[in-house]
Structures are given as structure tokens and as C-alpha cells.
Regions:
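N-terminal capping segments
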Residues: 1-73
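Glycine-rich catalytic cores of cysteine/serine-nucleophile enzymes that process amide/ester linkages
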Residues: 27-36, 56-66, 112-158
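Feature targets compositionally biased, intrinsically disordered low-complexity regions
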Residues: 34, 59, 90-93, 126, ...
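Short regulatory "switch" loops immediately downstream of catalytic or recognition motifs
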Residues: 48-54, 125-128, 165-167
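...with weaker cross-activation on analogous glycine-rich loops/strands in unrelated enzymes
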Residues: 63-137
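Low-complexity, Gly/Ser/Thr/Pro-rich intrinsically disordered linker/tail segments
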Residues: 134-136, 140-142, 149-197
């Protein structure tokens, strides 16, 4: 039985990108000093637009804490491989596509002077017709918002068009609880409730 597709909320992903482009969400570890934070930030944006993770060990796309995360959450090539996978399983999915197919909320990957791609920004604005000058991105490592693609010096570029996400369909897809966590819906006994916002 095929899983239904969850629509990708591009506006939510882009809003998240603008909110955290020059800051760090305290719910996620900052990998700036341990290889870079770009794909971690891209994954956070994508999660803001889909709300679905894939908790398959090693091959999934998930974040629990700094040490319990899938390689695809923080690794450029792993992110690409997960998003463009052919298997129908939980999590966001998409296709390698030309610049002309891009929309805000899609992703760009650059290859600089190495053999592999090494940077994953999110597209936050795109002109018509799209060009490297009017396609603007947000990123971490180095932090940017509304930065034109044309300001990067790269050897290769590829684009990821997000099509949606497959839902988590079984209880086994749920993550293990982090230490000290509280069951959803149960307030912590010793902590006052904080107002939303």
C-alpha cells in the first residue's frame, strides 16, 4: 500500500530560514566548529516545512540530539542521497532538477575545490526567469540570507526540488526518547510552563 504524500509547506521552510539564518535554534546543536552547520540548517528548514523525520538507523533522516542524528541530517552528499532516494519510506523526498524548476524552499548544493559537494543552502527567493543573480539563498557556514547564487565561486552546482514527504506510518518509526524527556502531553513536574512564542 502506497503512503500518502504530505505537501511541502514552502512558506514555513522559508520563514524558518529567515528566522534562523543569522542565529541558532537552541533545539539543535550547532556544528559550526565540527565540520560546518550548513546541512544541519538546511535539514531544520526542510523539517519546518514537512514535520516528518525518518528514524531508520544510518540510512534515515533524523535529529534527536547532537550525537543521535542520521548522516543525512548534517552531511551534504548523504542529504542529497536521502532526498533523491527511490524507496517510498517516511521523510521528505525530491528530485535533482534544473534551476528553471526551482521554487522558494528548494535546495542548492555546491562543489567547490573538492571531488564532492560541500554546501547546502536553501532558496528563499527566485526571479523570473530564474538566474544565478536573482536566485537568493539562506545558509549557515557562512551565515547568509538573501544572498545571490552568483556571489559564490564554485566548480559545480546542483538543485534539489522538494516534492513532499511520506508520513511516518508505523509505531516503529518513532524515535527513542532522549534522556530526561517527558511524554507528550504530560507537563514536567518541576518546571513551570513557558508561554508559547
Amino acid at each position: 500500500m502506497a503512503l500518502a504524500v504530505i505537501p511541502y509547506d514552502r512558506q514555513a521552510a522559508v520563514a524558518y530560514a529567515h528566522k534562523w539564518a543569522f542565529g541558532r535554534n537552541p533545539d539543535f546543536f550547532d556544528y559550526e566548529e565540527v565540520g560546518g552547520d550548513c546541512t544541519n540548517f538546511a535539514s531544520q528548514c526542510l523539517y519546518a516545512g514537512t514535520g516528518v523525520m525518518n528514524y531508520t538507523p544510518v540510512y534515515g533522516w533524523y535529529y534527536i540530539d547532537a550525537n543521535r542524528k542520521a548522516p543525512a541530517w548534517t552531511g551534504v552528499e548523504y542529504f542529497y542521497n536521502f532526498i533523491t532516494r527511490k524507496e517510498v519510506n517516511p521523510g521528505p523526498f525530491g528530485v535533482d532538477a534544473p534551476l528553471e524548476a526551482m521554487e522558494p524552499g528548494d535546495f542548492v548544493q555546491f562543489r567547490f575545490d573538492k571531488d564532492t559537494f560541500g554546501h547546502t543552502p536553501i532558496i528563499v527567493s527566485i526571479g523570473s526567469p530564474p538566474t544565478l543573480e536573482n536566485t537568493l539563498i539562506a545558509a549557515h557556514s557562512y551565515d547568509a540570507d538573501y544572498r545571490p547564487l552568483s556571489t559564490y565561486f564554485f566548480r559545480d552546482i546542483r538543485f534539489l526540488h522538494i516534492l513532499g514527504a511520506y508520513p511516518q506510518d508505523t509505531p516503529r518509526e518513532k524515535p527513542p526518547k532522549p534522556p530526561g524527556s517527558v511524554e507528550q502531553g504530560q507537563p514536567a513536574q518541576q518546571q513551570p510552563r513557558q508561554p508559547a512564542g
